[in-house]
Amino acid sequence: MSSMFVYVWGTVTDLLHSACSVLALNGDTESSGEHTAPGDTRHGHSSCPTDSRAMEEEEFEILLPEEPEEGTSQDPSPDRSGGFLGDEGTLQTLWLILVGKSGSGKSATGNSILGRRVFESKLSARPVTQAFQQGCRAWEGRELQVIDTPDILSPWAAGWATAQGVGEAGTGSLPKQYAVLLVTQLGRFTEEDQQVAGRLEEVFGKGILARTILVFTRKEDLDGRSLETYLRETDNRALAKLDDVCSRRHCGFNNKGDGAEQETQLRELMRHVEGVLKEPEGCAYSPPATPQPHAAPRESWGLWWLGAKEGRGDQAWLWGLHRILKEPEQAGRQLPPSTPI
């Protein structure tokens, strides 16, 4: 009987001890909840109900992202312009040569391509661009070298090139990757524009127009119509013929547009440039060897047509172009960041 009492008493004691332990544990839990509100992040931790295992897995996913799927390529590091560097960390260079008559919007188009104001552009009775100018930017894996040229028909064009020492330029070849952009104003394609196209063939040789892109400024004047429709319905036969000769590579530019619009315009232009680079013999051009010209007398610097008849005008413009093309190669280039115009 006594042994039975001892057994029962021991069992009751064990049960009471277990109950006290449970009550103490619940009290600690409630006390902890009184001092920490949901969402409190004191001591660097969040008290939101989060499973510790789930949190560890989430942190692991952030630190170690999933491996790319098989067959997908890993792009190299992007540059500041959104483009990508080459295998050796250098950008491929592409030259864009702007040509056209005075007032066509060459300089403004160059600024739109560069994404910032580099070339002087304003309304003037006298040609604003009287010298070959150069600007550059990085764009999607390429270094774009933009050349703004004097009016190829202007009397100041030959004068500047000769004064800068045409004889120093020497013979040579244009860059391996380049495109000629013939800039004209929408709705104002005149006989002078036809002369520009003819002068291009005189300077660069037959076939250059097949690797030239027509760039129409004042795209906003289309009032919602497409450039394709405008060119298809134009009654300007000279313009229609030139468009055909240029393999119908054309695009429009609104040089007053915002950044997004100008980026879209640049992408369309570059699509045509890629087509030019795929043309047979379109990636390189070497001018024929000619006697090295001597500086003309100052009195004749302004006589463009006289220079052309004597074989100096075309050479002066071409040698001026060669000079500006060589200058960036002789000195280290630093690509300025693209900033709004």
Swiss-Prot record:
Transmembrane segments: none annotated. Its main location: cytoplasm. One of its GO terms (cellular component) is cytosol. The keyword Nucleotide-binding applies. Residues 28-85 are annotated as: Disordered. Residues 148-151 are annotated as: G3. Residues 91-294 form the AIG1-type G domain. GTP binds at residues 100-108, 121, 218-220, 255. One of its GO terms (molecular function) is GTP binding. Residues 217-220 are annotated as: G4. It is found in: Cytoplasm, Cytosol. The keyword GTP-binding applies. Residues 127-131 are annotated as: G2. It comes from the Eukaryota. Residues 56-72 have a biased composition (Acidic residues). CDD domains: AIG1. Keywords: Cytoplasm, GTP-binding, Nucleotide-binding. Pfam families: AIG1. InterPro entries: G_AIG1, GIMA/IAN/Toc, P-loop_NTPase. Coiled coil: none annotated. Residues 100-107 are annotated as: G1. Belongs to the TRAFAC class TrmE-Era-EngA-EngB-Septin-like GTPase superfamily. AIG1/Toc34/Toc159-like paraseptin GTPase family. IAN subfamily. This is GTPase IMAP family member 6. It comes from Bos taurus (Bovine). The gene is GIMAP6.
